[in-house]
Amino acid sequence: MENIERELKIVELYKQGITQKQICKECKCSTNTISDVIDKYNIPRRAKRKKNKDLSKFKDYSLPETQYWIGYICADGNIQYDKNNRVYKVSLFSKEEEPINKFVKYFGEDTVSVHRRPTGIIEAYINSKELCEYFIQVYNIVPNKSNILNPSVGFTTNFILGYFDGDGCIRNSSEKQIRYECNITCGSKIFLEKIMNILDKQGIYSILYQHTDCLAYKIRIDRKADSEKFYKWLYKDAVVCLSRKLNNFVALYGNIENSKLGELQEFEGESAAKLKE
């Protein structure tokens, strides 16, 4: 194997999360060579593996905040289960600091690692075969889930809020036009139909349609009265949320009765500072 080809392969395997032992075996190199190559190509070093991981919160779906984060992972997360390369990882992705900080704070710094990609995406992840298997076997949240997402969990308000914070949006208003439209996007029609049925039972009118430029589907709530109902229903029992989206709703409809919401609107600056260290 030419040196340049081997270096590029080392870089690719390292970025995929393949263990150094496996990289050494496949590329016939030493760990020192791996270190030299990733430094040469300015690849950020991976966080050291966590030895004292506590997975109990992930497995206790009765906890409202766990419901929220399972929903968020369904939207903007990934399960990597690769027996051949021994890579087992549950990840959550965001361009924003806030959800990453809150995720780490809830599940613990001894459990969650954080990786900043050159693209600006931040990944919070847990390396654990046990956790991956729990997600797959118990929650039915599988690798490459986008178009087949159909988790076997309760679709609580906190779960739906977590999904909405990951893959939902509120149309931006302007000085000339106030918009009330809310959207929830997913590649799985079955998943969105379940949410739509729940909204219907709450008297919230919504429309389900397929994007014309891709395979994804979208729930749209565009009437002012229904958008306001959706907001009040979605956040009534919230224990954690993305403050940016909450503030957009508050700007349209004002505050609702939930003693936690004032705290939820505050960005956790101390956690952000710690994450940047």
What would you call each of these model-derived segments?
Residues 1-277:
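Internal intein/HINT superfamily modules and their associated LAGLIDADG
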